[in-house]
A protein has these predicted regions:
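Generic low-polarity alpha-helical segments
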Residues: 1, 8-11
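Compact beta-sheet-dominated domain cores in extracellular/mature segments
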Residues: 2-5, 24-130
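Bacterial N-terminal signal peptides
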Residues: 10-21
Length: 130
């Protein structure tokens, strides 16, 4: 019983030191060289067919254009919002536009999905399409 109590105390100590960093987590993405990227430098895209802060990219579309997922408890701030997808998962949006990756972008900074089928666009620092 004493060993369980010590293990529980250690777990509480780790949790106590972890909470402040979780509460003040950075924005889910950033601007890099004028383009919206995740924190690993992978380019993020918007989809012209999304409207009203709702993602219509599901099924095969979402396999090719994976959403920038939000963790449970993610907090919207400023232009950052969290939308609920049809499957119940949460996705980050910027200025009302759901954000996605492109599966063919393999390295940070690649923008191979930009202007794809004239409906997929890199989000720039002005919020405009590239």
């Amino acid at each position: 019983m004493k060993q369980i109590s010590q293990s529980f105390k250690a777990l509480l100590l780790v949790a106590a030191f972890s909470l402040p960093s979780m509460a003040f987590a950075a924005e889910p993405a950033m601007m890099k060289d004028g383009v919206m990227t995740d924190h690993k430098g992978m380019t993020l895209y918007t989809f012209d067919k999304d409207t009203g802060g709702k993602s219509v990219c599901t099924g095969q579309c979402a396999e090719n254009w994976p959403p920038l997922m939000a963790e449970a408890g993610a907090k919207p701030e400023g232009k950052w919002t969290v939308i609920k997808r049809d499957d119940g998962t949460m996705q980050w949006a910027y200025d009302g536009k759901p954000l996605y990756y492109f599966v063919k972008d393999k390295a940070p900074g690649e923008k191979t999905g930009d202007k794809m089928k004239d409906v997929w666009h890199v989000l720039t620092n002005s919020g405009a399409k590239m």
